[in-house]
Amino acid sequence: MPSSAFKINLSVSPWFFCSTWSSLICWPWTITTSVSRSTLSSTTWILWTWLFNSVSIFVSRWSFDFLYSLNSLRVTYSVFTGITGLLSLNCLLKLPENSTLLLSLSIIYQPEKVPFWSFSPCHEILFRYKTEFSLSLSHTSFLFSEI
C-alpha cells in the first residue's frame, strides 16, 4: 500500500468519526434547549450552534493534519481522539469543565501514560493496539486502548 494512501485514510477517518459523534451527542442538548425558547431566538440559537460545529470540524481537521505532519502518529491520534471524546462525554454527562481540561492536558503532555477514547458506530474499530477491549453501550462501541 502506498504511504500516501495510508496517510489519506488516517487523516480522514479519525476526524470524521469524532466530529460525527460529537454532533450526535451534543445536538440533542441543543435541540432541547432551543425548544423552550421563542421561535426567533431558537432559530438564532440553532444557527449559532451549527456555525460553531462547522468551524470546530474544520479546526479539528487542520489540527490533525498539522500534528500528522510532525510524524508523531500515535501521539496525534491519542491527543485528537482523546480530547474530542472528553468534550463529547462532557456534553453528554455535563461534567465539570475543569475535569475535561485537566484530562486533556494530561493527554497532551503524557500521552504514553493516558489511555485514549474512541467512539465508533456499530462496533467498527478504527485502530487496534496491543491491549484493547470493547464495551457495548447502547448502539455504540466504546474502545478503550492503552498506547
Curated annotation (Swiss-Prot):
Domain of life: Bacteria
Protein family according to the UniProt entry: To M.pneumoniae MPN_465.
Protein name stated in the entry: Uncharacterized protein MPN_037
Organism: Mycoplasma pneumoniae (strain ATCC 29342 / M129 / Subtype 1) (Mycoplasmoides pneumoniae)
